[in-house]
Structures are given as C-alpha cells and as structure tokens.
C-alpha cells in the first residue's frame, strides 16, 4: 500500500513538471470508486475513470451501473473531480450515452477507446458518432478485428498495423467542440497482443446475457522471455508516440491545405 505522504509527494512532483494526473480503476462498485477517489484527492488528480464489470442480463446490469453512478453523483459531485465511464467491450454506445444522460451528473462524461466497441459488435466510426457529444477523454490504440461466431473480438497490435481507422478517428475527435476542444485528454495505450473476445452478438435478443470478466490484462511470457518482452514494450510505446505524431502531422497538413485553397 502506498501511504498518503507518498501519494502527496507524487502529486507535487507531477505539478512541478506541469503534468495533470488521472486515476483509473477497472470497476464501478462503491469500494473501487472510494479507493480511486481517495487516491485522486491525495495526489491532486483532476479525473477518475471507471468501467463496470458485472454479469447478468443487460437490463439488470444497466440498473446496477446506474446505481453505481448515482452513488458517485451523490457522494462526489462536489469533490472537484471529473469522472469518465469508459466503453469497455460489453456495452454498446447508445447504452453508455443513456447512462450518462440519465445520471444528470454534469461532471460525468465518456472515455472513448479506439477499439473496445468491437467486442460489443460495433465499428469505430459508428460508435464515435453515437458517443461524440459526451466524449471528453480518449484511449488511443490499434487492433485487428477478429471474426468470431456471430460477433467480433479484437487483438491489440502495433499502431498503424491494425484495422482501426486511426486517422479518421483522430480527426473526428480533434474537431469535437465549438469554441474550445471538447476532448481534454488523450491516453496512448500500446497493448500489443492483448485479446478480448466478443461480448455482444448479431443474433442476441433485447436483453442478452452479459458475462463476467476479469479486469483487462496482457499475459506475461515465461520468465526467460520476460526481459526481452519488457524491452519490446518500451519500443512499442515509443513507436506509438511516433506514429501518432506522424498521423497528427498529416491531419495538420491537410487542414492547412484546405484553409489555403
């Protein structure tokens, strides 16, 4: 466990470097939210991201999540923190939008992940269009779409080598907002070899079963391969930064061309 003084020192260091801190937790229950908020307040973070992991029929799962969000609103809406719920493989875009709207919580918005809608049997641009009015944060990654029986899985890969419409997604997201950018944070997630199966299917009824799942993780290799894998993780992360910069430069050049012609 990290003590309060260590968390405070971490926050102080981030501020000296002119960095913001976002806390992320892979659940939405009371205990997980309380722990994440406590860390956020001790570090001086600005935002807490969460996503639900419940098993049950869709309507029951949505009801549980709505209760979780109500707890966040009633307990922490005056904390000074903002909150994001991430679309994370099991819920469809319109279901997430409904949760945010019905919460009537001004400090709650959506975190858009480049690939997580695939497992809910949606495609990136369609999901983005549905979620767009409520997106304030983004996880950038690339992935290969894996066709499964009646649904879709995704296997994360090196950015630029997958099926995600990388440039189109970035362009849409950058353009959100009128007088100022709507998206305030982009997280780069290079999760090479992470795999997530299909959770929603073409032939499902209007109240499908949502299976329980563990929090997302990429399996580690055997011990003798671990050092090489960790070196590759660092290389992959640097490559992703360079890829995103190159795509942003392309977008900038095209925008300048349109403005000047």
Describe the predicted segments one by one:
Residues 93-107, 118-261:
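Histidine-acidic metal/acid-base catalytic patches
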Residues 2-4:
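Short, small-residue-biased leader/transition segments that mark boundaries at the very start
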Residues 9-109, 119:
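Active-site acidic/histidine proton-transfer and metal-coordination neighborhood
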Residues 7-10, 66-70, 143, 147, ...:
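Membrane-targeting and insertion segments and their boundary/processing signals
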Residues 113:
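Active-site glycine-centered loops adjacent to acidic/histidine catalytic or metal-binding residues
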């Amino acid at each position: 466990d990290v003590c309060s003084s260590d968390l405070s020192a971490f926050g102080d260091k981030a501020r000296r470097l002119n960095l913001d801190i976002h806390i992320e937790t892979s659940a939405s229950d009371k205990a997980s939210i309380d722990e994440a908020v406590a860390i956020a307040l001790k570090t001086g973070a600005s935002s807490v991201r969460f996503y639900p992991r419940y098993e049950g029929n869709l309507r029951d799962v949505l009801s549980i999540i709505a209760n979780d969000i109500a707890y966040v609103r009633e307990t922490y809406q005056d904390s000074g923190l903002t909150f994001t719920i991430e679309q994370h493989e099991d819920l469809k875009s319109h279901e997430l939008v409904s949760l945010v709207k019905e919460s009537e919580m001004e400090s709650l918005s959506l975190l858009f992940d480049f690939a997580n809608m695939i497992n809910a049997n949606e495609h990136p641009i369609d999901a983005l269009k549905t979620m767009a009015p409520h997106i304030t944060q983004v996880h950038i990654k690339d992935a290969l779409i894996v066709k499964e029986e009646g649904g879709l899985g995704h296997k994360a890969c090196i950015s630029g080598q997958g099926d995600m419409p990388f440039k189109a997604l970035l362009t849409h997201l950058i353009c959100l907002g009128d007088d100022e950018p709507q998206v305030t944070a982009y997280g780069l997630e290079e999760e090479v070899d992470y795999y997530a199966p299909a959770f929603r299917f073409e032939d499902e009824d209007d109240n499908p079963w949502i299976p329980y799942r563990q929090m997302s993780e990429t399996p580690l290799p055997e011990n003798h391969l671990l050092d090489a894998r960790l070196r590759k993780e660092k290389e992959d992360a640097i490559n992703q930064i360079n890829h995103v910069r190159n795509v942003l430069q392309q977008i900038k050049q095209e925008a300048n061309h349109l403005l000047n012609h």
